[in-house]
């Protein structure tokens, strides 16, 4: 009898485990970095697509969602699905495709965040993906070799976004060295250069569209950093756009008096990272030249941060 009762309770135990897991995922997403959220979004879309595909397969009906989320090369199809220029970069269908893309994103994203704030990571991911999509569309509608397949071609995956991060790092920190398995230490500039050469060669392969998109992402990564050096953040508008969407769908808070301007999580983390970097610079200066070498402003910053 006790065994029978346990058997009946199994679905409830399973449901409890799922609910606890879902709660942990939500908390991790809410409290995680921009890199964590990008990875979660890609994984979430992948799982939803693959699970939904199972039901369509069992019903014996075509699976329509890839066509509605992947980026078409044909202009007329794109005009009816403009959102695909954004959705395609979060869309994967093959397990190995998403595995390698997310491993590459996790690895390069961590290095990127060592040099830049989270808002710039979001900007370069999204705009690198858009630039890659535009290269793909332009290539398929410009070169005669694609004339017969342009109407049926679709692009999906985060590869263009990831390679944008790689080339951005190669321009900003060309001598940053990575330890590659079976190879040893390799500088970032050589990793980016090798990748770009392989993408150019790969245009004549079966994945011509993907390689065109990779080149577009690589191009954006270079342009973004070069403009950033001139004091121009080409990705600022995309973060403002997402912040506006977040405020639009966020429930209205209760009205209360506040003398400080509220900031979102990304902005808060950006400010904290800047403060931390500034303090480290001041401490390094003290260790090298002593406390008396600090300027009046640096002493005030150190005093203020010590009180917090």
Listing of model-derived features with the role each one plays in the protein:
Residues 2-274, 278, 282:
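A detector for small-residue-rich transmembrane helices and their helix-helix packing motifs
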Residues 273-308:
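Terminal membrane-proximal soluble interaction domains of membrane-associated proteins
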